[in-house]
């Protein structure tokens, strides 16, 4: 491993290149700070690359397919009602790539240094960034941690094989499952459930009654009513 000989100075270091991280980086640069943004995976974070945006693409496709199924009721022939998952996956990748390029261009326009690597604190005002065989050291005035979150696997899930999916990888499936069990009740879980149901899966939603409700009681009741109608 090659260790940088010079400790580099920055006003602001941001660890995490998701919406929180790159938005803070842009604002810091606009205020005249020297900013370095560190992301160990793809710029845009989980939201853009594996979570929110892929979920919205699938939800949009599902809503369009649901519209087609009702055209016959209006006397409109819908032709061959087929669904091509590979085309949807290609479209999803195009959307993600375009949005990621937009974030990259925003960072360039604001003169933000973007480093792909893993950051480790060496002192209260110093970090090391590992990128392959390179290890660079930075001292900073301020640091923002925007590392995001990751799904928590329920304790009762003991078999973590290929059939157990997370919100981070379900939108990369190469075929629509015949039966899908969704555990959770936040908006991502409900988007997964509704989109895969519209695309052909038989979907069952599971959640703990004891867990805190994500939505207001009236919204929860309305969602429950709508999902029951779609059985």
Language model features: what each stretch is:
Residues 6-18, 176-186:
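Beta1/beta-strand and adjacent pyrophosphate-binding region of the FAD-binding site
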Residues 13, 128, 202-204:
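A generic structural signal for ordered secondary structure
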Residues 18-22, 42-43, 151, 171, ...:
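Residue-level detector of alpha-helix initiation sites
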Residues 2-10, 26-33, 38-176, 209-213, ...:
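Glycine-rich flavin
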Residues 163, 174-210, 214-215:
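Rossmann-like NAD(P)H-binding beta-loop-alpha module
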Residues 11-37, 190-198:
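N-terminal Rossmann-like FAD-binding beta1-loop-alpha1 element of flavoenzymes
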């Amino acid at each position: 491993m090659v260790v940088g000989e010079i400790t580099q100075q920055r006003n602001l270091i941001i660890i995490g290149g998701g919406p929180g991280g790159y938005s803070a980086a842009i604002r810091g640069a606009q205020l005249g700070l020297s900013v370095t943004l560190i992301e160990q995976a793809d710029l845009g974070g989980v939201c853009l690359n594996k979570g929110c945006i892929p979920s919205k693409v699938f939800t949009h496709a599902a809503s369009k397919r649901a519209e087609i199924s009702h055209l016959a009721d209006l006397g409109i022939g819908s032709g061959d009602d087929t669904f091509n998952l590979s085309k949807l996956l290609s479209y999803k990748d195009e959307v993600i790539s375009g949005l990621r390029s937009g974030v990259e261009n925003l960072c360039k326009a604001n003169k933000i240094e973007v480093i792909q690597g893993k950051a480790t604190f060496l002192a209260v005002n110093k970090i090391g960034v590992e990128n392959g065989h390179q290890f660079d050291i930075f001292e900073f005035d301020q640091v923002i941690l925007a590392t995001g979150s990751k799904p928590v696997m329920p304790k009762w899930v003991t078999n973590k094989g290929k059939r157990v999916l997370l919100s981070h990888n379900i939108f990369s499936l190469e075929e629509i499952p015949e039966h899908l069990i969704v555990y959770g009740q936040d908006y991502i879980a409900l988007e997964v459930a509704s989109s895969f149901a519209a695309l052909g899966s038989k979907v069952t939603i599971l959640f703990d009654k004891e867990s805190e409700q994500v939505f207001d009681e009236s919204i929860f009741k309305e969602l429950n009513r709508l999902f029951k109608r779609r059985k």
